């Protein structure tokens, strides 16, 4: 946590930035935009199938499959033009996933499910610009009070037909992104800070919370991924900033957005922004 100097406070008041109606992020002098952060992907080789699977031919909603668990498998997403499909498998209370891409079929220990059911999304795109398309999968792995977590997987097909998963690392949106967040306090105002951007979070704070006990902000347990495809654009990350203070878990006060890029086995978050929620 940092205290805003009187000069900055005066500047904000003179320019009208102190008004309660202000919703946009404010510019913080003497700072620079948050720099991109990167981390290596979590690499997993797809397993050869351990049994002969009778693959379903029709796509069903994940909720429908959950309601009729008498069926051990379900096709949850497909890309007909690329001859690719994503399957969920249940056996003896264990779950795993199958990815079929042309003549390739591999098992992965991917999670999916709820209690909030969010359907997996599947794309085929040359994400890293190497001239070869990859399968892109976003699957929902966690939900609950203050929790909404999705995973991002980029799968490459190797020359021998095997499939390799490059997963977006949790540490990038948890530890690394959290380290860029901060709070700034004036006499009666509290701001969330990301690079040169400020968001007034005074009204988002619990009534009985003393801002002085704030250690800062973290990203909590919110991570979502989406794309602009088939239009131009890339992969988007959306998260949240929550209080780092004893007794206030998952108390979210601002939203975070960024773009995701992938190349050479490394993921990068760039164009980071902080927004009022």
Describe the role of every protein-language-model region.
Residues 1-8:
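Positively charged n-region of N-terminal signal peptides that target proteins for export
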Residues 24-125, 137-277:
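Beta-propeller-forming repeat regions
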Residues 15-16:
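C-terminal motif of bacterial Sec signal peptides marking the signal peptidase cleavage site
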Residues 130, 134:
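Acidic carboxylate motifs that coordinate Ca2+ or other divalent cations, activating on Asp/Glu
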